[in-house]
Amino acid sequence: MLAKRIIPCLDVKDGQVVKGVQFRNHEIIGDIVPLAQRYAQEGADELVFYDITASSDGRVVDKSWVARVAEVIDIPFCVAGGIKSVEDASQILTFGADKISINSPALADPTLITRLADRYGVQCIVVGIDTWYDTESDSYQVYQFTGDEKRTKATTWQTEDWVKEVQLRGAGEIVLNMMNQDGVRNGYDLRQLQQMRAICHVPLIASGGAGTPDHFLEAFRDADVDGALAASVFHKKIINIGELKKYLSEQGVEIRVC
């Protein structure tokens, strides 16, 4: 059995790490490189960086900090933000990222997933899915351009259908960003994770809602996700990664303990 992964998420805007609640009202957390170093030292398995306004601004992620991060950490990291071509991806990977993640650009052009997978291999192609639970229809809907609350909009995709589609097109991993739970710290949406796990045959990463060590445990134990991504609990030092991994190991979760 592969070890489960603990993945801090760093949302980047204007060169700094920020964090919002339900993808809105972002506050500045701090500088990118020191935070990356801290999480690597605490025992994170990998890091994810989202340049959250790149797609809505029509630009590619700023590469200057990608190279700086690569110089100071020795764990894998993934970068997302406005990657719309094989050439964009090539630059990010050349600057030192281990994986690239696409979200809104994949919705605009699903063939991008296949082109990237064919060029670089599925192992480094992640598809991020921003999913919103609509209470009226009791359904999960895919959203795009979520980094800019003025431009955020629903797509025509149901989350379940998009999860199936991106796998067919070559996604090597899926990060499910559950917007209703984002930054609220009341636990991952286990029902949604279980529903998507049943149809997801590539690594599935839970994102949105972590507030306590037990929330991570529930995601691994009850939804069988491959990794759990979180931001505010790590940024604000509510949870220490090393202590979290020790707790999960004691509960029987297969995890790399520092």
Curated annotation (Swiss-Prot):
GO biological process, alphabetically ordered: L-histidine biosynthetic process
Domain of life: Bacteria
GO cellular component, one term: cytoplasm
GO molecular function: imidazoleglycerol-phosphate synthase activity; lyase activity
Pfam families: His_biosynth (PF00977)
Keywords noted in UniProt: Amino-acid biosynthesis, Cytoplasm, Histidine biosynthesis, Lyase
EC number: 4.3.2.10
Keyword RNA-binding attached: no
Record flagged with keyword Nucleotide-binding: no
Main location: cytoplasm
Subcellular location: Cytoplasm
Catalytic residues identified in the record: D11, D130
UniProt xrefs under InterPro entries: Aldolase_TIM, His_biosynth, HisF, IGPS_HisA/HisF, RibuloseP-bd_barrel
Catalytic activity: 5-[(5-phospho-1-deoxy-D-ribulos-1-ylimino)methylamino]-1-(5-phospho-beta-D-ribosyl)imidazole-4-carboxamide + L-glutamine = D-erythro-1-(imidazol-4-yl)glycerol 3-phosphate + 5-amino-1-(5-phospho-beta-D-ribosyl)imidazole-4-carboxamide + L-glutamate + H(+)
Pathway where this protein functions: Amino-acid biosynthesis; L-histidine biosynthesis; L-histidine from 5-phospho-alpha-D-ribose 1-diphosphate: step 5/9
Function: IGPS catalyzes the conversion of PRFAR and glutamine to IGP, AICAR and glutamate. The HisF subunit catalyzes the cyclization activity that produces IGP and AICAR from PRFAR using the ammonia provided by the HisH subunit.
Subunit architecture: Heterodimer of HisH and HisF.
Family according to the record: Belongs to the HisA/HisF family.
PANTHER family: IMIDAZOLE GLYCEROL PHOSPHATE SYNTHASE HISHF (PTHR21235:SF2), IMIDAZOLE GLYCEROL PHOSPHATE SYNTHASE SUBUNIT HISF/H IGP SYNTHASE SUBUNIT HISF/H (PTHR21235)
Name this polypeptide is given: Imidazole glycerol phosphate synthase subunit HisF
Annotated organism of origin: Yersinia pestis (strain Pestoides F)
